[in-house]
């Protein structure tokens, strides 16, 4: 019995350590994303994978009758958004966003990084619609050869706006061991604001409001949640019920239900209360991290990329939609971030963290082109045409891998330069310390000799 108990005690801390590692959890999600693409297109597994993804699960007395693939997107992903909401609340209260002046540059960069990709996406697709192989004003899908009007393809303008914070930090952890913490803090702040803006995009552009009375229920759930999580002893069963009710009411109201997680997360206290050792928002986010990073995100990625292509070939890389997403994420994201940073510091008079220059942010800005989670979600919401949705998710996957590879190379080189600079600075500091020590010894020797007392002590130090 003791052995079993010890094993259980050892397994959960290990799971939490894995979930806390941006590098490992990011690689796990990438593995599931690639597995979904393979399983959906291998002849031996495609039928079984589709059967599982399309199996419907319903909740009685509601309109909730969704296939498992949609439950992963609308249900499990709520855990991720709850974690995001809790982290946002903590950052807004005591973290990097608590002081707007200090966070001004990365906050503005997040806005710039969300404006530029849609512009490049629309410009690229517009060029293909005018000068591509199809009729003017339309584009050709690589998988089926069918013609899609530019107006319909332009619905995906929001797909390349989001940054996947988990993958971006995973790339930093893999390739940037010697970088100063200010670069990671900059990326964290930028990605946090990016998440907030992406949530607003989903709420405004990809929700269709139904009956207004559901909003009364959502408001009641919000008030009850805010009260319950402030009690000295939190009634977890009641909290869980309120959270589920808020999710159902969001769904019934026509708002994307994952936003229920953000709502209740933002209502959770982010300051220490009742004599506790840490804020509740921080603790709850820490406890939810394993479920978010190792359950919700991998399963979502599995089904999000698990789209079947009739003709899986390298021609997919020549799809106008895929190329537009690559340009938007790999070029547009870093371009928007760097240009905004330059304007903010050189024109706006704002300052970056001490020791950081705008060009130091280029590798991290390229890492912001890694889309994945929220981009997959927006691709599913933006296109009702399944062929377009499939190509969009494939484009996000390819663009994210390219951005990760480029940023990995740039971060590795930058890390070596910082490491060399740190070594030179350390050597100079040691040399200066030796000189100062030698000077002190000589001064002590001369002062002792100049002492007129009978007892003279001379200390010769080598």
UniProtKB/Swiss-Prot annotation:
Q: Which domain of life is it from?
A: Bacteria
Q: How does it sit in the membrane?
A: Multi-pass membrane protein
Q: Which Gene3D superfamilies match?
A: Na+/H+ antiporter like domain
* Xref: Pfam families: Na_H_antiport_1 (PF06965)
Q: Where in the cell does this protein reside? A: Cell membrane
Q: Which GO terms describe its molecular function?
A: sodium:proton antiporter activity
Reaction catalysis annotation = Na(+)(in) + 2 H(+)(out) = Na(+)(out) + 2 H(+)(in)
Give GO BP annotations, semicolon-separated.
regulation of pH
What residue ranges are annotated as transmembrane? Answer: 24-44, 66-86, 102-122, 156-176, 196-216, 235-255, 256-275, 290-310, 312-332, 361-381, 392-412
Sorted alphabetically, the keyword list is: Antiport, Cell membrane, Ion transport, Membrane, Sodium, Sodium transport, Transmembrane, Transmembrane helix, Transport
A cellular-component GO term for this protein? plasma membrane
| InterPro entries reported in the protein's UniProt record | Na/H_antiporter_dom_sf, NhaA
The entry assigns this protein to a family as follows:
Belongs to the NhaA Na(+)/H(+) (TC 2.A.33) antiporter family.
Tell me the function of this protein.
Answer: Na(+)/H(+) antiporter that extrudes sodium in exchange for external protons.
Please identify the protein, giving its name as recorded.
Na(+)/H(+) antiporter NhaA
* Organism classification: Bacteria, Bacillati, Actinomycetota, Actinomycetes, Bifidobacteriales
